[in-house]
């Protein structure tokens, strides 16, 4: 059976330390929406992590190199996003100490069998206070992450919080809806999805930038909730962003509304067919 393998040079001290940190963390985590470590190997030249079978690649591959004849259906995209939210919810509240991923992006969302979302790449993770503590999660940290996903509050203060992951996930939600990268390098102004999409929501032009394949395929009630959630994740003030648990519940509700609308449409189709 094929496995997902991650390789890294062992000649760098920083790389070796990051590798060790990732192994220790992965050995403590068990959740269906986190990639499962099977084993690892270290020699003089290379460090290797061996993960479970990843049957359908990364989410990025399905947008950057997607098959134009078979793009991801809307419900599947929504289910993938719910899976990522569940994985993040577990990291933030389901382990002894809150864990902040810090690098939630399309490349780090892998798709296993049955298209189950698997959050991967824990190199940049930071451990916070006990997850059951009522203390506000704030960790002083050297700013790290990926351009296009970086939380402006984190950039400004160097204080890492669970809402940093929420911000990254908000970018992912709009990427999934629009089938566009977080930063459009082909644009003259190198537009950032985190700025551009909420601006389009505000001025009522969001329908003009969503994936053309999805036009007419998303139930209006589902669309509104999804867009509202994505926009709220990208609020400038991190205290105004929802917790990831709220995001998870909202996305699950959006899926329910989509399934209800799809069922109603099938019922109408059957009814109209029987009338002929």
Question: What is each stretch, according to the model?
Answer:
Residues 1-276:
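Conserved eukaryotic protein kinase-like
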